[in-house]
Amino acid sequence: MSHTIRDKQKLKARTSKIQGQVIALKKMLDEPHECAAVLQQIAAIRGAVNGLMREVIKGHLTEHIVHQGDEARREEDLDVILKVLDSYIK
């Protein structure tokens, strides 16, 4: 079973939190708000997205790297995660 399926409820809860934060940001932009409050909301969204990414990466590393018995498959999975990290960190 894929770790994203096994952890589906936890991951969906995180995405719901992110969705709520984005909706709140959109409302803030429709009304007059201090720039600091808008920046704080953006930082909160970024933190929530980073937390989601961290959880999925941890699951991937555990499931597909640490517990992968096939060395060739482990190298393929590692290459995938490194490419994802490169694109995420850009």
UniProtKB/Swiss-Prot annotation:
Report any one BP term from Gene Ontology: negative regulation of DNA-templated transcription
Gene3D superfamilies given for it? Answer: Metal-sensitive repressor, helix protomer (1.20.58.1000)
GO CC aspect terms: cytoplasm
Sorted keywords for this record are: Cytoplasm, DNA-binding, Repressor, Transcription, Transcription regulation
Which cell locations does it reside in?
A: Cytoplasm
Task: Cite a single GO MF annotation.
Answer: DNA binding
Tell me the domain of life. Answer: Bacteria
Disulfide cross-links: none
Its function, per the record, reads:
Repressor of rcnA expression. Acts by binding specifically to the rcnA promoter in the absence of nickel and cobalt. In the presence of one of these metals, it has a weaker affinity for rcnA promoter.
Q: Which family does it belong to?
A: Belongs to the FrmR/RcnR family.
Q: This chain belongs to which protein, by name?
A: Transcriptional repressor RcnR
**Gene it is expressed from:** rcnR
